[in-house]
A protein has these predicted regions:
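Conserved protein kinase catalytic core
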Residues: 39, 252, 344-346
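Single conserved hydrophobic/aromatic residue that forms the stacking wall/gate
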Residues: 334-346
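Hydrophobic alpha-helical transmembrane segments of multi-pass inner membrane proteins, especially
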Residues: 23-231, 270-330
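TM-adjacent membrane-interface loops and short helices in multi-pass inner/ER membrane proteins
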Residues: 217, 221-265, 276-280
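Alpha-helical transmembrane segments of integral membrane proteins, especially early/N-terminal helices
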Residues: 12-21, 79-87, 237-245
């Protein structure tokens, strides 16, 4: 049990400070997300903001409750949590309902659950437990990373089956960050990347038509400005219309005239960019970077590898979501409907 006692993350004083910072920043970003939903509904709470507000309140109390649970508990049950989320992915494949072209949702009463989102946490916990319990000399060998690769590829394959290319990509990127933190040699990443590049043309043939269309549209949205390229073009127009100071809450022309697509989900950050302007966007990104920094500080000050991986894994998860979402808006990354919006990240 000695290894369990070694899992305390950092000193109580530092943990309280970082914990309060993480919670406070999460609340602020959640409120900004609710404000965006309020604006997306043309000044009404009862369409999207009210439901999201209830979920934020529930999750707030869940987070408070979880803060009293010793991290050893999550370590001990890491594989169990992973197994449950994996089973939910399989159940979603069999009994789940389809939304936006993919079978990825489960209904539990009035609550809809997306198992692939739960898997992000389950995978982080499972990898943290494995690498913590494995000798560093073994991690540096190919044999030592076979099992964590298996832990990663099984849910990735199930998520791709839905199909949900965006979430599968996120799982791979976050897992890659965890492998690096755990001490896996750089040359192994290079070999994997080389394999991906070589097999890229083959993988293209296995993509769904709508996924190929998104990639081609991203490269040249003007080729179909009224069809597949409409979302990207309107998003860029909205961002540009925001200028330095923004057009003001409920004053965004793209938003109020309903030119902005999916403004309550995938393009909510575009809505905020139009109404809050460049200054507002910088402030929001600063809050996100501060939140990620707090997670990294928790990781760096942790005494055990499992604690470092859990904190760094969550930081990586946030960063990947933000990078892809902002990249989609600025057309520096391909947009997929699977990627979560600002309100989901917050």
């Amino acid at each position: 049990m000695a290894y369990l006692r070694s899992l305390s993350m950092i000193s109580p004083l530092s943990l309280n400070f970082y914990g309060i910072m993480v919670l406070g920043l999460s609340v602020i970003l959640s409120l900004i997300g609710l404000l965006g939903l309020y604006s997306a509904a043309n000044g009404q709470f009862d369409i999207w903001a009210e439901k999201q507000g209830i979920m934020v309140l529930i999750l707030f109390f869940i987070v408070i409750a979880f803060s009293f649970i010793n991290i050893n508990v999550f370590y001990c049950y890491a594989y169990h949590i992973y197994a449950v989320t994996l089973v939910l992915l399989v159940v979603a494949e069999i009994l789940g309902y389809t939304a936006m072209g993919a079978q990825r949702w489960l209904r539990f009463g009035f609550v809809n659950i997306q198992p692939s989102e739960l898997m992000k946490i389950g995978l982080i916990l499972a990898l943290a437990r494995y690498f913590h319990a494995t000798k560093f000399t073994e991690i540096k060998t190919w044999k030592g990373i076979i099992f964590p690769i298996f832990l990663t590829l099984v849910p990735v394959a199930l998520v791709l089956k839905q199909p949900n290319l965006g979430t599968a990509t996120i799982l791979l990127l976050v897992s890659g960050a965890i492998f690096f933190i755990a001490g896996v040699k750089i040359y192994k990443f290079a070999l994997v990347l080389g394999g991906v590049i070589i097999t890229g043309p083959i993988c293209w043939n296995f993509l769904h038509d709508y996924q190929k269309q998104r990639i081609m549209t991203f490269l040249n949205p003007e080729s179909d400005h009224l069809g597949a390229g409409y979302n990207i073009i309107q998003s860029q127009v909205a961002v540009g219309a925001g200028g330095i100071y923004g057009q003001g809450l409920l004053q965004g022309s793209q938003n109020q005239l309903d030119f902005l697509p999916e403004k309550h989900t995938d393009f909510i950050f575009t809505l905020l960019a139009e109404e809050c302007g460049f200054i507002g966007v910088v402030l929001i990104l600063a809050l996100y970077m501060l939140l990620i920094s707090m997670c990294w500080l928790i990781s760096r000050n942790s005494n055990a590898l499992a604690s470092r991986i859990i904190a760094a894994g969550i930081a990586s998860l946030l960063f990947v979501h933000i990078f892809i979402n902002i990249g989609m808006i600025s057309r520096s990354e391909e947009h997929t409907s699977e990627l979560q919006s600002l309100r989901h990240i917050s």
